[in-house]
Design a protein with these regions (language model features):
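Short, glycine/charge-rich flexible loops or terminal/linker lids adjacent to PRPP-binding catalytic cores
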Residues: 1-46, 56-61
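Active-site metal-binding loops of divalent metal-dependent hydrolases
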Residues: 50-52
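PRPP-dependent phosphoribosyltransferase catalytic core
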Residues: 2-14, 64-182
């Protein structure tokens, strides 16, 4: 009852050549330092919540901002916690708890970022696209090489094909439903 909730809107943004990326504020939201200062302004204990904590790209970006603003993190709660994520929280000094613990997870995939026309990671552009469109990339073949290091060529091809087929099936189901309604 005596709590405040505030979402931190982050986005993984690739450079135009896809060589590197950074964690930034989601388009049309306040810059990350401002979002963290907003949380600090409530002067309440902070509990960070996410669906999964593995390599901690986002929390690595947020940790220095939380420290700069003297925003204490009382707890990190996640659905899935991996051994790598647990070790990172230990390094940062954040208490962490998860519903499921996956100590030896080597790779993870976020399906929504792999499906063309459904999701993806943002690609930096100097000009904005019309209609609120976001330039994005799906890290699958043929758009870009998958960024998963221990994956051989055949496995990358099979993963890419699976993502393309799933995206097609989802879009066909949506089209069928739309045509049935209209």
């Amino acid at each position: 009852p005596n709590t405040v909730t505030k979402t931190l809107r982050t986005d993984k943004v690739y450079e135009a050549d896809l060589s590197t990326y950074s964690i930034e504020a989601y388009p049309d939201y306040s810059p990350l330092p401002d979002q963290v200062r907003t949380i600090r302004a409530f002067d309440r204990p902070v509990i960070l919540v996410d669906d999964m904590l593995h390599d901690g790209k986002r929390i690595r970006r947020l940790a220095p901002l939380l420290e700069e603003t003297h925003t204490p993190v009382d707890q990190v709660l996640v659905g899935y916690l991996t051994g790598v994520g647990r070790d990172l929280m230990e390094q940062l000094g954040y208490p962490v708890d998860g519903i499921y613990y996956l100590p030896n997870l080597r790779m993870r995939f976020v399906e929504s970022t792999l499906y063309p026309f459904i999701g993806g990671d943002t690609v930096r552009r100097t000009e904005r696209l019309p209609g609120g469109l976001q330039p994005s990339v799906n890290r699958i073949l043929p758009y870009a090489a998958p960024e998963f290091a221990p994956m051989d060529g055949r496995t990358a091809w099979e993963l890419s094909l699976c993502c393309l087929e799933n995206a097609r099936d989802i879009l066909l189901a949506l089209e069928t439903e739309f045509r049935g309604l209209y």
